[in-house]
Amino acid sequence: MAIEKATKGQDYLKTLIKEFPSSHAIKNCATSDYDGLVMSFRSSLGELVVDPISANYDARVAGDGPQACDRELANEKIVNPSVSKMNNEMTFLSDVAYLATNYLRK
């Protein structure tokens, strides 16, 4: 679920690049920030059985991308409630994945 939501979120951000071509923040959100989010969720899922400690770490750092996106948007004084909501949801999913994988380590 998290991978699918993150991918859809990244697709949405890519449409915003076309609407705001001069925004470095939106470009970073759509590329590096959400690339990291999707890759971390995928990596965490792939490591669940073989390396639960790494899966736990990747679940935690997945939330870094959406948080960075929020900071970048704030620095450019861009207010977009749908992106803020999406970033909050992605951070929440990262927290849930972290807690779930933390439980598996025990």
Language model segments and positions:
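Folded extracytoplasmic luminal domains of secretory or organellar precursors
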Residues: 1-106
